[in-house]
Amino acid sequence: MIWAYRILFLPVFILSIPYILWHAKRRGGYKKDFHHKFGNVPYREPSSSQSKRIWIQAVSVGEIRAIKPLIEALSAKPEVELVLTTTTSTGYKIAHETYENHVAGIYYFPLDFVPFTKKAWRRIRPDFCLLMEGELWPEHIHQAKRNKVPIALINARLSDSTYRLYQRLGGLTRSIFKSLDLILASSDSNATRFLDLGTRQENTKPVGNIKCDVPAPPPLGDGEAIALRKELGLPAASDKNQTLILCGASTWKGEERSLITICEALQKNGIDLRLIITPRHVERRKDIEAELQNTSLKYHIRSRGSATEDVQIVIADTTGELTKFIQLSDLVFVGRSLPPHTGGQTPIEAGMLGKPTLFGPGMANFRDIARSLLNADIATQVEDEEALRITVEELCADPEKRQAKGRNAQAWLVANQGATQRTLEAIQKFM
């Protein structure tokens, strides 16, 4: 089966080059160390008989942040050496900022084609490999088997679309899954999906979602919150000031227009709702600004420095600040969930920070977490823009309900922790 993959990879990759170059230029990524993607990572001496070198691959920012408790626990073991790879430029940046003192090396993951993958394997020389969530790189997995190195998929999940794709691929998918030594699923339903696709019962276990174990950041101090509000052009909170903030977290095209419309409508109804838009792709700032120019609302673009006047809307076009903006907010809308979007973005961060959370019907990629938040009365699911407007208006008018949802979120988080420890226990046999 690996030969079929290799034959298909090259023409698909060649056809994709224009898009890859356009995408990299548009997002300003891969300016440094792009050669890693061709396997040109630094040579590492073989690990000693008393130590284990673990190669962890986490595709982007969300996964890089999610593995923090795991990396901290593994790096504390004197017999363990870690090498971390990631796929995206933003993930690479966050990895260096977060893990420089915890890992032996941080590189870009090689393109999954035999010459690049083999070169990276010859240079990294791992004793054990970990893949995050749904990353199944056939060549990487093949090299693990070829080198007799165990490989595990952790925090494993399958979106609806990926599950359907793997079902259609049939034998190719089964051969990949059979090469995995361990699959630690993020939920019971995800474990069932993997088993349906042909994984072995003894190697497939639900352990929970390790993202629930990521420590919540310390709350913003009063002074820090006041300073941040001032920088953004938002009024300071007080008993007399009834200003409320809605954060649109990781929004996609079309959703910003809906949130702007809702903000306008509530302002006209006498509700002082301010909006922080954090687009999933920050390079879309010009498109969002164009939407705002057709309104009477004042706005500020975060990357341009501190606001010089009071504004109704902030375009938060910076990376690494979403957590602060969620903390500053009273309500959080999770992006990529309103029609026509269907996949959703992770709602965990809003939940773990104790914020009432809203999302549309399209949460297929985070179905289990979304359902859990709904059942715990933390989140509210809406069908469309009008339903979102009604729900936001109701929550703005009901502070007790907002506070109750926040308390529910804290209880939910405590109840869902422990996946990192269960993951460590499960992989111990390979170390």
Kindly label every feature range from the protein language model.
Residues M1-M431:
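Nucleotide-activated sugar donor-binding and catalytic core shared by glycosyltransferases
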